[in-house]
Amino acid sequence: MDLKGLTAVELGKKIQAKEVTVKEAVEACFAQIDKVEKEVNSFVSLQKEAALKRAEEVQKLIDDGTLSGPLAGVPVAIKDNMCTEGVTTTCSSKILSNFVPTFSAEAVLNLEKAGAVVIGKTNMDEFAMGSTTETSYYGETKNPWNLEHVPGGSSGGSCAAVAALEVPYALGSDTGGSIRQPSSYCGIVGIKPTYGTVSRYGLIAYGSSLDQIGPVARDVTDCATVLETIASHDVKDSTSVERQDTDFTSALVNDVKGMKIGIPKDYFGEGLDEEVKKPILEAAEVLKNAGAEIEEFDLELVKYAIPAYYVIASAEASSNLSRFDGVKYGYRTKDYEELHQMYKKTRSEGFGPEVKRRIMLGSFVLSSGYYDAYYLKALRTKALIKKAFDSAFAKYDMILAPAAPTTAPKLGASLSDPIKMYLGDIYTISVNLAGLPGISIPVGRDAKGLPVGMQLIGDCFQEKKLFQAAYTYECLTEKKWVSMYDKTEAAGKEEA
């Protein structure tokens, strides 16, 4: 039986029905990893021995009847900025290359309680700072659809692993689009939940007021199932929200009749590639024909989202990353005489260029002479953006938008021009600033065969509406754009 094309829920059903053992499921993942990993580079580390041992333990619990559920025995990959007890957690940075946590992130623990088997830690942009997964200390990850293109970022390793069929689903984190944009580039489904839905305990912080953990998978059902599993109130995270409505799978209903969907004119103007715009508007038409009410509207303030985001995120990063100094854990330079030299050389040698750029920017905007002019102004802009969304959601159930302005760029195209890379998040970062949920689903391909993703944005705690609309689209198109075959066999270089 070919297991690699199964979704997480499909695989879970076969494990429960005793058609497949947990060991067979894990071995199928590693067989595919052996086949494609050298080309794709989705993982920073693999835990084959530990995963096979865990598979035996989970199988025993399933056989005893003490463990059931849709994810029991199903393999998962974890983005390498989430702590995993006893397993190196690097944030794809040299400075944490030898860091082994003594505890696991709450989201990881929730998956393990549900019987998930962690097979490895995925590659990412260093400290989640980037949109291409090219800033990793462990080398760039490539897009399985075409190995000359990026998978997006910063959760590019998780998204590439799912797209390359190395694992049925994975966890990512989203600070400014880091789940939705790479999901779009890789032709998979990814959701950033409402801020506070998933505990940030054990997630190594980038921008604490923006970070949120979420799942990436091959279809909407998997995403809803995983989010239902990892969403929980956690006293260890002061921003965690106690929700009673996390039965997300109950929203998987093929029906959008009467749903009001707003399309922001500002998102479909200059800067949006025609090959991205066309399939998204066609997808909107599919929902309209199914009974949804589609209407254009103005969401003008979002044009200020990028400057506001990079001021706020960089300010929080400069504070969060000050703890990495070589004293208690992580990389420490060997060549120093004085303590201040050790700090300086450790951080200079341990951080990559993009991380240094954002730390410097953050330190600048927080400095006494510029705090009011930049940081305070950015916070006010953030509040105004939230107000603009509140006005929109007074009229609409959700907003339909692109997840990215283009399909996946070529490797190296954004590295030499950081501003170009930052603009790749133009449609996603306002969602983080407002703390809203957003889902990306595949809706087409461009002329090169690269995936196009559509983003649905909801009001706070309205993930169910997003899942319902996304699931309906999937049903109406019979998962036409979902990769359910081994595309990596055909992936390769474009002809000259």
Regions found by a protein language model. Name each.
Residues 18, 79, 219:
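Short, conserved phosphate/pyrophosphate- and ester-handling motifs at nucleotide-, phospho-/glycolipid
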Residues 13, 301-302, 325-433, 483-492:
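Serine-dependent amide/ester hydrolase catalytic core
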Residues 31, 35, 164-170, 175-271, ...:
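Structural helix-boundary/capping segments
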Residues 29, 51, 79, 111, ...:
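Conserved hydrophobic/aromatic pocket- or pore-lining residues that grip, position, or stack substrates
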Residues 1-53, 289-291, 364, 482-496:
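An N-terminal boundary/leader segment
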Residues 71-91, 250-262, 315-386, 437-453:
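Short helix-loop capping/hinge segments that flank enzyme active sites or metal/cofactor-binding pockets
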Residues 25-29, 308-309, 355-363:
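Short alpha-helical scaffolding segments that buttress acidic/His motifs in well-ordered protein cores
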Residues 71-213, 264-266, 315, 401-419:
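Short glycine/serine-rich loop/turn segments
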